[in-house]
Curated annotation (Swiss-Prot):
It comes from the Bacteria. Disulfide bonds: none annotated. HAMAP family: Fe_traffic_YggX (MF_00686). Keywords: Iron. One of its GO terms (molecular function) is iron ion binding. One of its GO terms (cellular component) is cytosol. One of its GO terms (biological process) is cellular response to oxidative stress. Gene3D superfamilies: Fe(II) trafficking protein YggX. InterPro entries: Fe_traffick_prot_YggX (IPR007457), Fe_traffick_prot_YggX_sf (IPR036766). This is Probable Fe(2+)-trafficking protein.
């Protein structure tokens, strides 16, 4: 049986992650409070942030920026919107 969590992002009980997705205390908080579905949403948003802001992940400042955005996305006021991103019209 899959592990379930009360997902902080979705506001409902959902299937939890199999392991902490990030090292340290932040990774443990995410593992305990974030569902697989919400994590997949973050990965899509993170990809947009990297692409639209042309982040170089070899740069420690870019990685620190993404870590702050990840924490804000799940536990704060929300992550930054991807600069220049225009959602497709329906």
């Amino acid at each position: 049986m899959a592990r379930t969590v009360q997902c902080i992002k979705l506001g409902k009980e959902a299937e939890g992650l199999d392991f902490p997705p990030y090292p340290g205390e932040l990774g443990q908080r995410i593992w305990a409070n974030v569902s697989k579905q919400a994590w997949a949403g973050w990965l899509k948003h993170q990809t947009m942030l990297v692409n639209e802001n042309r982040l170089n992940l070899a740069d420690a400042r870019a990685r620190q920026y993404l870590a702050r955005q990840m924490e804000n996305h799940f536990f704060g006021s929300g992550a930054d919107a991807a600069a220049g991103y225009v959602p497709p019209s329906a």
